[in-house]
Design a protein with these regions (language model features):
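Charged, often Cys/His-bearing segments associated with DNA-binding zinc-finger transcription factors
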Residues: 1-53, 201
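Short, solvent-exposed segments of well-ordered alpha helices
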Residues: 55-58, 143
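Ser/Thr-centered flexible coil motifs
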Residues: 31, 57, 216-218
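Short, amphipathic alpha-helical "recognition" segments used to contact nucleic acids or chromatin
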Residues: 57-71
């Protein structure tokens, strides 16, 4: 493990680890409901698989996982803070994410819930990832960076309803929406949807603003009203990015979908 101590990168050995690693108390901007919800799920998981003993309790494991997801703390930092090994931290985090991901609602379930709403808002976001320039599949020309494309549905007040599986960043928003079956699900539910210009050509259920520079007055007024409604969907993006791990993901791209689902479940647990 390499840590930055007094401006120098130092390799930590077992013999001098206690002398060089500093641990301090900190806070997580989450409610105790998040902690109780996750701890309860982890305790149930341990009973299910017949776990007899572990280094830390379900409550401490839940706290560790929340620190990782919400604050973006690394495995090495968490290992030092909780007095366990880095490999153990990795296993605990992965287990918790898998447990939460299985609880995430499907698109069909969300459509049934949203059928009572006047409309929903659809938008796409790019979750930045740690990739080299050669990985063109993950490079978004729109955002000029590498990342994963995630589609988000919100209610009319901007509350997060659903987040899609993650696709490579080069995927266009409309292509992603069609890949996930969002357009077909909206049409089947006869649910109105507001979206930006990236979804031009999506069809009847999706309402988009007019394109072009020489628009008539009524078209400009329509676009202005459309933007005021659509901007509420940005609150959902802020909700996702409030979990600092999603601001720069360094894990395998195959695990990002489960991470997003885990965040969604934690958000719904206390919403």
């Amino acid at each position: 493990v390499k840590l930055l101590v007094d401006g120098f990168t130092t390799k930590i050995t077992r013999a001098d680890q206690e002398l060089r690693v500093l641990v301090y108390p900190s806070a997580i901007d989450l409610s105790s409901d998040h902690l109780r919800h996750l701890a309860g799920r982890l305790a149930a998981r341990r009973r299910e698989i017949g776990t007899r003993w572990r280094r830390i309790t379900p409550g401490r494991q839940a706290l560790l996982v929340l620190a990782h997801l919400r604050c973006g703390d690394t495995y090495a930092q968490l290992a030092a803070g909780f007095g366990i090994g880095v490999a153990t931290v990795y296993r605990y985090v992965r287990e918790a994410i898998e447990v939460l991901a299985t609880l995430a609602p499907s698109l069909a379930q969300v459509m049934r819930t949203a059928s009572r709403l006047a409309f929903v808002i659809l938008d796409g976001t790019l979750l930045p990832i740690d990739r080299i320039a050669a990985d063109t599949r993950y490079y978004s020309g729109k955002h000029k960076r590498h990342g994963m494309n995630v589609q988000v549905l919100t209610d009319p007040f901007g509350r997060l309803l659903w987040a899609s599986p993650a696709l490579p960043g080069s995927t266009h928003d409309l292509t992603a929406a069609r890949t996930h079956g969002i357009i077909e699900a909206l049409a089947a539910a006869e649910l109105k949807c507001w979206a930006d210009k990236a979804y031009q050509g999506a069809g009847c259920p999706v309402r988009v603003p007019f394109r072009g520079r020489r628009l008539k007055r009524w078209q400009r007024r329509h676009n202005s009203t459309h933007a005021k409604i659509r901007c509420l969907g940005e609150q959902a993006m802020a909700t996702l990015k409030g979990w600092r791990l999603l601001r720069k993901l360094r894990c395998s791209t195959n695990r990002i979908t489960d991470v997003v689902k885990a965040v969604l479940v934690l958000h719904h647990a206390t919403a």
